[in-house]
């Protein structure tokens, strides 16, 4: 059957480059105001429509605070049933706790899930949880390190997600 899906949020699902310094400086109120200026990566809308249409269980695992993740999910109407934010499981990525929490919320075992992210910590957390890990190269700021992160798969375009979840 189809895999349950775990996504990182920033630079994986949505290009939030414009919010990076605000997030780094924990200027959350200003970041919230500027979510409308972020952009969905090319091809991601189609991927999310397939996830929605097939009722594929989907979680976001992020090191950002819950209100930030919730606001982006609402802004883009993402087909996400579960959010594991900075506030929801500790220690955060690269520790597996957030990934294990996502599995628990979705009611699936690690072998029935697949995880997508743009950072080494995404790959490390997924691997530590026993989840198939996918390095997403379209938004990453860690290209060199990500190449050597021990991922299960590497992809360069969002539409490649569909071949991996089927």
Name these PLM-found stretches.
Residues 79-93:
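A short, structured active-site edge motif that brings together acidic residues
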Residues 95-123:
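Conserved Lys-Pro-Asp/Glu-containing loop-to-beta segment of HAD-superfamily phosphomonoesterases
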Residues 115-154:
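Acidic, Mg2+-coordinating phosphoryl-transfer loop and its flanking beta/alpha structural elements
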């Amino acid at each position: 059957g189809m895999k349950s899906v775990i996504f990182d949020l920033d630079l994986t699902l949505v290009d939030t480059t414009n919010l990076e310094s605000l997030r780094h400086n924990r200027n959350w109120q200003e970041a919230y105001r500027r979510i409308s200026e972020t952009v969905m990566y090319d091809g991601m809308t189609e991927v999310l429509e397939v996830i929605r249409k097939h009722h594929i269980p989907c979680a976001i695992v992020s090191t950002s605070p819950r209100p930030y993740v919730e606001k982006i999910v609402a802004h883009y109407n993402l087909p996400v049933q579960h959010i594991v934010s900075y506030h929801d499981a500790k220690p955060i990525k690269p520790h597996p706790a957030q990934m294990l929490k996502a599995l628990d919320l979705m009611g699936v075992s690690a072998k029935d899930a697949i995880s997508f992210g743009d950072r080494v910590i995404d790959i490390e957390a997924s691997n530590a949880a026993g989840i198939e890990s996918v390095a997403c190269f379209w938004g990453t700021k860690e290209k060199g390190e990500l190449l050597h992160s021990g991922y299960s798969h590497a992809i360069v375009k969002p539409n490649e997600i569909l071949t991996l979840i089927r």
